[in-house]
Amino acid sequence: MENEVNAGTASSSRWNPTKDQITLLENLYKEGIRTPSADQIQQITGRLRAYGHIEGKNVFYWFQNHKARQRQKQKQERMAYFNRLLHKTSRFFYPPPCSNVGCVSPYYLQQASDHHMNQHGSVYTNDLLHRNNVMIPSGGYEKRTVTQHQKQLSDIRTTAATRMPISPSSLRFDRFALRDNCYAGEDINVNSSGRKTLPLFPLQPLNASNADGMGSSSFALGSDSPVDCSSDGAGREQPFIDFFSGGSTSTRFDSNGNGL
């Protein structure tokens, strides 16, 4: 019997709001009441009892639950708004047009594989700076082919080869080409590197012919012009010093090149 009484009391204490009660509570919420005080709860409860059964705690919990539901609803509406905005923007979004500065492809360095050898070792051509793509006046792109790169490499190698310094070992001289104190220019020799040196002593014999009948050459060391060997002492006897045999023997010749 007691259990039935408790069940009836519990069922009777459960609040089932009527439509008029909900309408009145929502109007109060819209007026700005969010957390009513104890006096406000008693006043609201007295007004709502005219429309049905209600207690003070029912009024308190209704405002708490309604406030939480409104916050959740506003959060969902904001999320839905941002999702629609993002979807709409992504559909009609286009990247900005490329300018002549921002859309140029990056540079890369390419080292020439060809090399030239001289007395100091290998001499490589300078590194080349290429672009994979270049802008043309119409605003489009022009692709550089491998053939164009190879042609440019070939042109630069040719230019580098023409500017290579001549090795001193490549200059050939006649042992019997120069006469004593008879040099091109003002007794100054210019080597292949462009540096001027003074002749300290004669390096070659003077106006002499070898046993095979080879004549004297008119080419001087480091000079592009012929050597004028018409000196005053053409008729006198000239000594011949052999610097290449390693000996110290000095042989004298007459004006015709015959040994004395």
From Swiss-Prot:
GO biological process: one example: cotyledon development
CDD domains xref list: homeodomain
SMART domains hit by this protein: HOX (SM00389)
Highest taxon of the lineage: Eukaryota
GO cellular component, one term: nucleus
Spans through the membrane: none
Major site of localization recorded for this protein: nucleus
Pfam families cross-referenced by the UniProt entry: Homeodomain
Transcription among keywords: yes
InterPro entries noted in UniProt: HD (IPR001356), Homeodomain-like_sf (IPR009057), WUSCHEL-like (IPR044555)
Record's subcellular location: Nucleus
GO function terms (MF aspect): DNA binding; DNA-binding transcription factor activity
DNA-binding region per Swiss-Prot/TrEMBL record: 10-74
Keyword Transcription regulation: yes
Family as reported in the entry's similarity comment: Belongs to the WUS homeobox family.
Protein task: Probable transcription factor involved in embryonic patterning. Required for apical embryo development after fertilization. Its specific localization to the apical daughter cell of the zygote, while WOX8 is confined to the basal cell, suggests that the asymmetric division of the plant zygote separates determinants of apical and basal cell fates.
Protein name: WUSCHEL-related homeobox 2
Source species of the chain: Arabidopsis thaliana (Mouse-ear cress)
